[in-house]
Every structure is written in structure tokens, then in C-alpha cells.
Amino acid sequence: MDGIKYVVVTDKSIRLLVKNQYTSNVESGSTRTEIKHWVELFFGVKVIAMNSHRLPGKGRRMGPIMGHTMHYRRMIITLQPGYSIPPLRTKRT
């Protein structure tokens, strides 16, 4: 399992860092418990809450043919006070 794909850097995600909440896109087939165990083992932190939602894929047109990108899952991970996750690589768009 790959776990976290990349960190999401938006206005809301930067605002949530003050509350010790980290936002990232993860594999669409992974569950909350899988991601929670993976984050706790890999980073050595304690997760107290996880919020997730699935975002729809975007439409892409190639001439007369309409296609779409794959949907993905976004997780907001809340850590216990005193714990933090080091900066991860962000996806450039």
C-alpha cells in the first residue's frame, strides 16, 4: 500500500495546520483505519481523528470524445497536541 499520494496545499489546509490537522490525498481504495495505522507507524504520531471525503474526477475532452480523470479520496488527519508531521513533498500543478 502506498498510503499518502501527496499533501494538499490550499488556503483551508494551511489554516488547518494551526489546529494540528494535516490534509492529503490518499489512494482511493484505502480505508480510514488503514491510513490511520499507516500514519501512526510511519511518522510515529498519535492520530485522534480522521475525516475523509471522495472528490469526483474532472471531465477532460480530446476532440469530440469526452473522458474524465479518476476520482480520489482526501483525508484530514488530526493529531494529538505535541505531535507533528514533517513537511512532505507537494504535487506541483
From Swiss-Prot:
Belongs to the universal ribosomal protein uL23 family. GO terms for cellular component: chloroplast; ribonucleoprotein complex; ribosome. Binds to 23S rRNA. Part of the 50S ribosomal subunit. InterPro entries: Nucleotide-bd_a/b_plait_sf (IPR012677), Ribosomal_uL23-like (IPR013025), Ribosomal_uL23/eL15/eS24_sf (IPR012678), Ribosomal_uL23_CS (IPR001014). This is Large ribosomal subunit protein uL23cz/uL23cy. Keywords: Chloroplast, Plastid, Ribonucleoprotein, Ribosomal protein, RNA-binding, rRNA-binding. It is found in: Plastid, Chloroplast. One of its GO terms (biological process) is translation. It comes from the Eukaryota. One of its GO terms (molecular function) is mRNA binding. Signal peptide: none annotated. PROSITE patterns: RIBOSOMAL_L23. Its main location: plastid. It holds the Pfam family Ribosomal_L23.
